[in-house]
């Protein structure tokens, strides 16, 4: 959703980030509540003084009949790095130094402090690890070293270190003093660097597959044919606790990492992971089809990309009728300019967007898509 604002209405993107900045005091309270430094932004946020508003329970469990416990508010902490990354992308696209000096630098430093204090040292492995989390895939709870979470945390800490170095090189001593007074991060540079250098970052195994978390690749398989092709909802047959014991994804996780940071791994690794995780993903989140669609487009899988794009575009138009409770605005990412620079994928006129924007350059993109209604 943020991308669609950033590359069509950057002032709207600025307001979204400004809202997050106004919630920073509550985010610092939440981090302290869990014994951490810095700031931990809420998974679900409302008014700026509300803090975390994620409910602790949901609908009745299909197996037990009891309310489903909801752990996202305490475990889906990758939102912290996601917000920091959004700040980075905003500055990268707009060169809005005033915003960074007023809000952005502070947000990135505070979130970096959280990650550095959240990581736990494993003496046997000689590395820092992040335990008890939910990555983007919400059918995997209480996991350790989720790839998306750890790589984004690593980026967050390293970006904070890069900011401190740039400001020092630019002679911004007054700004550094102000940031130290607000965050205490300037004097913790060596401490943060140690965490960044030793944080566990899951690597591809012998097959080239990046472990979604420490347990995922060792879990048994589940035949997903009835759910991927038969139209059945997996939560009508299993509860989330059961699904945590299988190689089943609710939504893009490793593929989300590869979509957000495609330069982390070579294309052959991206392809292997796309194929592996697409086969195990039931796309029960409206935010999943679009991520897989963009990744397939980057890989030159034109028909696959367009098939998934149509599914994403039809979330509020096809069966299910869940849009009565609100439309799925996050799918705007699939229709927006995804960074600047365009790579045309030849084949059926499909176009995807790729690249890194130059500072100060914005694109307004108007995409007209004709979806044909075909007779069955």
Where in the sequence are the language-model features?
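Acidic/polar loop patches that form or flank catalytic/metal-binding clefts of enzymes
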Residues: 12-17, 28-31, 162-174, 304, ...
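Conserved functional hotspot residues or short segments at active or partner-binding sites
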Residues: 108
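Short coil/turn linking the two alpha-helices of tandem helical-hairpin repeats
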Residues: 91-92, 300
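Terminal accessory carbohydrate-recognition/targeting modules of carbohydrate-active enzymes
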Residues: 301, 344-376
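Acidic/histidine-rich catalytic neighborhood
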Residues: 114-183
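Short beta-alpha connecting loops at secondary-structure transitions
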Residues: 134-145, 316-328
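Helix-terminus loop motifs that line ligand-binding clefts
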Residues: 11-85, 91, 97-102, 111, ...
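Active-site core of glycosidic bond-cleaving carbohydrate-active enzymes
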Residues: 1-26, 76, 80-85, 102, ...
């Amino acid at each position: 959703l943020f991308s669609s604002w950033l590359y069509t209405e950057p002032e709207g993107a600025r307001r979204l980030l400004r809202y997050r900045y106004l919630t920073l005091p509550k985010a610092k309270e939440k981090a302290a509540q869990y014994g951490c430094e810095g700031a931990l932004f809420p998974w679900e946020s409302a008014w700026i003084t509300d803090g975390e508003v994620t409910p602790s329970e949901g609908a009745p469990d299909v197996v037990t009949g009891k309310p489903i416990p909801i752990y996202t508010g305490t475990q889906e902490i990758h939102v912290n790095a996601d917000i920091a990354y959004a700040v980075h992308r905003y500055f990268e696209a707009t060169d809005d130094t005033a915003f960074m000096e007023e809000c952005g630098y502070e947000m990135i430093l505070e979130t970096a402090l959280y990650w550095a204090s959240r990581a736990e040292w494993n003496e046997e492995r000689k590395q820092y690890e992040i335990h008890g989390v939910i990555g983007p895939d919400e059918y995997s709870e209480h996991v350790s070293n989720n790839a998306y979470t750890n790589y984004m945390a690593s980026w967050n800490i390293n970006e904070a270190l890069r900011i401190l170095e740039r400001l020092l090189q630019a002679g911004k001593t007054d700004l550094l003093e102000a940031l130290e007074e607000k965050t205490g991060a300037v004097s913790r540079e060596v401490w943060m660097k140690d965490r960044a250098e030793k944080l566990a970052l899951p690597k591809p195994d012998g097959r080239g597959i990046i472990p979604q978390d420490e347990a995922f690749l060792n879990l048994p398989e589940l035949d997903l044919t009835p759910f991927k092709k038969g139209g059945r909802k997996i939560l009508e047959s299993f509860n989330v606790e059961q699904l945590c014991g299988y190689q089943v994804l609710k939504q893009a996780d490793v593929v989300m990492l590869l979509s957000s940071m495609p330069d982390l791994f070579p294309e052959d690794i991206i392809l292997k992971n796309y194929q592996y995780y697409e086969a195990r993903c039931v796309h029960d989140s409206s935010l999943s089809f679009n991520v897989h669609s963009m990744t397939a487009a980057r890989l030159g899988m034109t028909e696959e990309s367009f098939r998934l794009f149509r599914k994403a575009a039809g979330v509020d138009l096809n069966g299910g009728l869940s849009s009565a409770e609100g439309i799925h605005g996050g799918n705007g990412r699939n229709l927006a300019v995804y960074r600047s620079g365009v790579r045309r994928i030849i084949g059926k006129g499909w176009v995807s967007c790729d690249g890194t924007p130059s500072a100060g350059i914005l694109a307004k993109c108007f995409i007209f898509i004709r979806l044909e209604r075909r007779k069955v």
